[in-house]
Structures are given as structure tokens and as C-alpha cells.
Amino acid sequence: MLGFSTILYNTKFMDTYYTIEEKYLQAVDKLSYGKTTKGLKLLNEIISNDPLYARAHHQLGMLYYYEVKDYQTAGYHFKTCMELEPSFPDNYTHYLDLLVFLNMEKLVNNVSVKALNTPGVDTAEVYSLLGLFHEKSKDWTKALINYQKAFMEVTDHNDKIDIEQSIKRIRSKMKHTLAYTYQITE
């Protein structure tokens, strides 16, 4: 939910007022140029002034997941973002990626259902992550079904190639598993 509060930001020369959205965009800009500590500081300022600003929680989740590798804190921020702004599509795939990585079955199922019902979410990525989750669980049939669904949804050429490779990998694992299945006949 976008707020319209203002935050005081001091510079050496003058006091300048920024809206929370402007401060958020500054933080995202800092992060995109590799200035992680400055971006983190700005995001924490936003959260301290407006703890309900969902998109700052999303960016913090990404920082803690991909940069800091603090998965519990990342999960907290992704979950908070999802609760505060459930229609924000960008959050779902990153949160789901974390849950698949941590093998959290119940949350994977719950978040994937919400993601697939949220407009703007990359459904191919959601199905691909579900395929990966089931592949890690060695449930080849469910993995294949989800990778095939991902294939039907994908629009990016490189993502399509990745999904095709995942499907081939699962089929190979299925054949390999069948090769080691023994039948006892009497």
C-alpha cells in the first residue's frame, strides 16, 4: 500500500523533504548500482517511519535472501510484504524461491496457490519452482506435471530453454528409477 507521508532527509546544504515513495526509489536505485549498505540504510529508515510500507519489506527480503543469506529475516520480510500488499506480484516468486530452497512444504503449497491467483505473477516461474520442489522431494510425476505447466505458460526464450532442460532431466530420472525397479515373479 503506497503511503503519502513525508520523511526528513538531511543533506549538508539544506533540509529536503522526500515522500516515502521517493525514498523507496532512492533505495532501489542504490541497490541497482551495488550500493547495498546505502540501500539497506534507506529501507530501514522507511520501515522505521512506516512499518506498513510493503514494498520496502519486499526489498529487504531480497537483500536478506540473496545478499546476506539470512533466510529467517528474508522470510519475515517476504511474508510481511505478502500480508500487507497481497496484490503485489513481484514478491511471490522470490518468497516461493526461498520456501522451495528451505523445503517448507506447507508454505510452498499455500504461497503458490496465492501466487497463481494474483494478477501479474509470473505463473511460469511459479510452476517451475513447484516442479523444482517436487523434484527435490523425488516426486517425479508431480515435478513433471508442474514443469509441463511452466512450459505452457512461459514466454521468455531463455526461460523456455531452462524449462525444457528441466523436463528432460525429470524424464531421465524417471527412466533411471524404472531401470532399478525389480519385479518378483513366482
State the predicted function of each range.
Residues 10-20, 144-186:
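Terminal, low-structured helical/coil segments at or just beyond the last alpha-helical repeat
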Residues 59, 94, 129, 163-166:
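Canonical tetratricopeptide repeat
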Residues 28, 62-63, 97, 132, ...:
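Residue-level recognition of tetratricopeptide repeat
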Residues 32-41, 68-80, 102-114, 139-146, ...:
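Structural signature of tandem alpha-helical TPR/SEL1-like repeats
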